[in-house]
């Protein structure tokens, strides 16, 4: 499987890049942006917008909006279909068609953020670099199609969002039930056809 030998990385922030040295040590090919390559020279640079074939997968890097250079990915495979992977971004300024799977950031929820800002638990700048649940839902509504098989909410803050409530809100607002959130040990099946 592609993920067993190749690892796309979105940005240089340590919550995303700290495992790059181990990945390289164990022979994985790491792909990312030039910013990551400047810190980890063995990481291969993906050029934004250029489709690349890796094994049975096609992968295309798309620039995202963050405090450092950051990529999301369009990943396609004949058995999985089209996967959109976007994290560490304040918005996703693209429209997609015929997507089977979204792995998309939903870092915080406005009411939780306001409470935590008032209590000085989190800084305002953190919120500016990450997608709020309402923005994630709006993105998913704008990109919804009958091809959709699954949504996985990723990069959820431990303090600024209630994951179970976020999943329920996405289900309610989209009328789509196969919604999960990422957590340690989560395994998801990415099939093109309904499972």
Language-model segments: which ranges?
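Active-site metal-binding motif and surrounding structural segment of the metallo-beta-lactamase
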Residues: 1-35
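Cap/insert and terminal regions of metallo-dependent hydrolase folds
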Residues: 96-184
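Short active-site oxyanion
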Residues: 24-30, 81-83, 178
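Core dinuclear metal-dependent hydrolase active-site scaffold
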Residues: 1-3, 18, 46-101, 188-195
